[in-house]
Amino acid sequence: MKLFLLLLFLLHISHTFTASRPISEFRALLSLKTSLTGAGDDKNSPLSSWKVSTSFCTWIGVTCDVSRRHVTSLDLSGLNLSGTLSPDVSHLRLLQNLSLAENLISGPIPPEISSLSGLRHLNLSNNVFNGSFPDEISSGLVNLRVLDVYNNNLTGDLPVSVTNLTQLRHLHLGGNYFAGKIPPSYGSWPVIEYLAVSGNELVGKIPPEIGNLTTLRELYIGYYNAFEDGLPPEIGNLSELVRFDGANCGLTGEIPPEIGKLQKLDTLFLQVNVFSGPLTWELGTLSSLKSMDLSNNMFTGEIPASFAELKNLTLLNLFRNKLHGEIPEFIGDLPELEVLQLWENNFTGSIPQKLGENGKLNLVDLSSNKLTGTLPPNMCSGNKLETLITLGNFLFGSIPDSLGKCESLTRIRMGENFLNGSIPKGLFGLPKLTQVELQDNYLSGELPVAGGVSVNLGQISLSNNQLSGPLPPAIGNFTGVQKLLLDGNKFQGPIPSEVGKLQQLSKIDFSHNLFSGRIAPEISRCKLLTFVDLSRNELSGEIPNEITAMKILNYLNLSRNHLVGSIPGSISSMQSLTSLDFSYNNLSGLVPGTGQFSYFNYTSFLGNPDLCGPYLGPCKDGVAKGGHQSHSKGPLSASMKLLLVLGLLVCSIAFAVVAIIKARSLKKASESRAWRLTAFQRLDFTCDDVLDSLKEDNIIGKGGAGIVYKGVMPNGDLVAVKRLAAMSRGSSHDHGFNAEIQTLGRIRHRHIVRLLGFCSNHETNLLVYEYMPNGSLGEVLHGKKGGHLHWDTRYKIALEAAKGLCYLHHDCSPLIVHRDVKSNNILLDSNFEAHVADFGLAKFLQDSGTSECMSAIAGSYGYIAPEYAYTLKVDEKSDVYSFGVVLLELVTGRKPVGEFGDGVDIVQWVRKMTDSNKDSVLKVLDPRLSSIPIHEVTHVFYVAMLCVEEQAVERPTMREVVQILTEIPKLPPSKDQPMTESAPESELSPKSGVQSPPDLLNL
């Protein structure tokens, strides 16, 4: 019996010891693997090496101590893992480094991590962790040096408890949803060197206690935050500060003079704020400063003389302020200056003549000022100058010959000045040149194009000068040119057939010159042409039949020449041609009346005495003869008068009958307010089910047409219910209701939101749509998780939305104009497939070419086509413009308005930054796109710029947009031409060390 009791006692002790024994590190790692989806045992799994049969010290991402018994480092960064972080990670007792960055791990941060008392580095950045930051971490991780939770979904106030981490040197809390104020206790870390709270939703004042961080080297507080007031004077106490980024966070007032104490500062970014007053003199005492961006503020006054002491300055951005006075001569003496951007101010006087003599100048933009004088002669003395922009000033004199030898030059924009003399020889042969804009000057001489030209040149604009001589055949060597604008000059001689070699050409304008001879039929080889203007020349001969080979041509102007012969009837088949002008030539014969000719105005054919047809008079050969040409034009006969009287009487009776019927129907309607469901397909719910959704908590959107609710039907299906604004009885348009019902009720297309049915009680109308769980493109793209929307997904959305609009424009009869195309009206389903939505403003396009209600709204701000301002008319080309804005949003990641200064939208900004040159797309590319197929992005950008052309006739149709997007070039990877290129890191964003955010399709 005693032996039995002894055995029971030993068994109990053994069980107790086993139950209390901590989980082994081996099992902790297996638990971690189980919690992370995408980490299975298949060979393609990123954690496929984590097998029971092998030592965990050999597993990927695992580092052990010398005894190979304990894990000291776990680095699973960038493995595309999802799921949650298992609390069992806390059993890796000797862990010093934990990095799970650049994955898709969600859920809360487990507070159990606090038991890892030896942890020094914790990096959870670029995931989708949510909830509040656990305070337990701050009490347990006493040895923590690095804490990085950048770019997650963490909420609540900024954690105060992290100030207990006295060993902390690097803290990155940016890119989350933290709210509230920066706590004053954030000034108490004794050894911190890096602090980032940028990209949150912080408010209030910047606490003066921040000045106590005397060891701080980098401080990032900008972007999405909206602070009150300006910088506290205590900022000057940060004696070790090297980088300070306070851009775009609502700062006001003047820059405090105490900033001059920051003698180690090399980077100062305060752009896109509301700073005012003069530029602080003490800025010139920052002897270590290399980059200073104070652009997009409201600074006044002149550039301080103290700036002459900034001998290390490489970047000076003061554009978009209210500065005046002369540009000081010492700017040209700064020995390290590489970037100088002073555009959109009120600077006067001349450009410093020594500018560029330091041999390091890379970018100069002095446009939109009031500068006079001549151009500095040695701006490219170091052969590093890439961009030179001086447009919109009062500069005179010649263009320096040295620019014709500047092999580094990629863009030159000197339009809208008073420059004279000839274009420097060699300019068009520069190997990297992509854009030349010299329009609206007084340049003379011949076009200096020899055998060797720049094949990269995408745009040549020489309009409105005094250039003369023949157009050299070597112009055909500009194989990459997209826009060739030579209008308003004195060019003469024939148009060379070599123009047909310009396969990338989309716009050609040779109007207002002295060109003679026939129209070169070879021009038809330029398949991408959308705009051709050869008007006001001395051209002769016949219109070539080959012109019909240009399948996407929108605009063709051959007016005021000496063309003869008949108009080719084959032009009638050019469906894309929307504007044509053959007036004031010597054409003859009958104007075709079929196909596209039925859309052209008769004024397009005036001034051709031998042309005949409608409005032009009868043809000489008697084609128009018949027995219906002679009608009495005298006074009306008695019988005709009687018929008119009887007609009026009948109409009066008819109106009376209609009025009686209408009155009875209104009375009947007022007696019955029952809800009625009209279904466009089989539905498993009733109006009562729909009405149950109309609760405040279910609101998911509000717009001009009404409120949208999320509804759950009895069978579990999700729907979106749009409650339209109350309408007055008898309203002919019912606030968009009739238009939506007539269009959506019969539309079935994969990329258009499906209308399931509608409920009505004669006073209120409810539209029931299929539900789109991922919301709108605008919400996703412009939210803080827009970086997760990778390029492949963006391109897919662009093509799908284009197909939806194409269906409305080309496959509906009559065609449908959306009128409010925008990123918020492109909805995304669970697979991020795009669906065009919101037809509350859609109208049928009548045969007349105008919409049925021109007083209706024509779209949303930032998306409205420019012609609406003076025509008040909307057509399908207005939708094309709006879609082009959406494409620019996808490429740049920016909203259409609100980010570029007063009165500037995304189209104007992109044109300013790239000069509409597709090869400059990297200058505006969304910095959140870390790795992209550059040829695809360039092509989509090219399509976007076609869509937002100023003139509607120059825009492609949506069918052409789909075709061009579908035929996007696919370049094979090679050693010389990589498939992907890294997007340049934004100067405005702090470096986070993060390169590839996850794709939303994998969420």
From Swiss-Prot:
Q: Which UniProt keywords apply?
A: ATP-binding, Cell membrane, Developmental protein, Differentiation, Glycoprotein, Kinase, Leucine-rich repeat, Membrane, Nucleotide-binding, Phosphoprotein, Receptor, Repeat, Serine/threonine-protein kinase, Signal, Transferase, Transmembrane, Transmembrane helix
Residue numbers bearing the Phosphoserine modification:
855, 996
- The UniProt entry annotates the active site at 820 (proton acceptor)
Which Enzyme Commission numbers does its entry carry? Answer: 2.7.11.1
Q: Where is this region: Disordered?
A: 969-1003
Q: Which residues carry this modification: Phosphothreonine?
A: 686, 871
For this protein, the parts annotated as crossing the membrane are 641-661
Membrane among the record's keywords? Answer: yes
Single GO molecular-function term? protein serine kinase activity
The Protein kinase domain sits at 694-971
Its record classes its membrane topology as: Single-pass type I membrane protein
Q: What is catalysed by this protein? A: L-seryl-[protein] + ATP = O-phospho-L-seryl-[protein] + ADP + H(+); L-threonyl-[protein] + ATP = O-phospho-L-threonyl-[protein] + ADP + H(+)
Family in the record: Belongs to the protein kinase superfamily. Ser/Thr protein kinase family.
Q: What does this gene product do?
A: Necessary for male gametophyte development, as well as ovule specification and function. Involved in cell-cell communication process required during early anther development, and regulating cell division and differentiation to organize cell layers. Required for the development of high-ordered vascular strands within the leaf and a correlated control of leaf shape, size and symmetry. May regulate the CLV1-dependent CLV3-mediated signaling in meristems maintenance.
Name recorded for this polypeptide: Leucine-rich repeat receptor-like serine/threonine-protein kinase BAM1
Q: What is the lineage of its organism?
A: Eukaryota, Viridiplantae, Streptophyta, Embryophyta, Tracheophyta
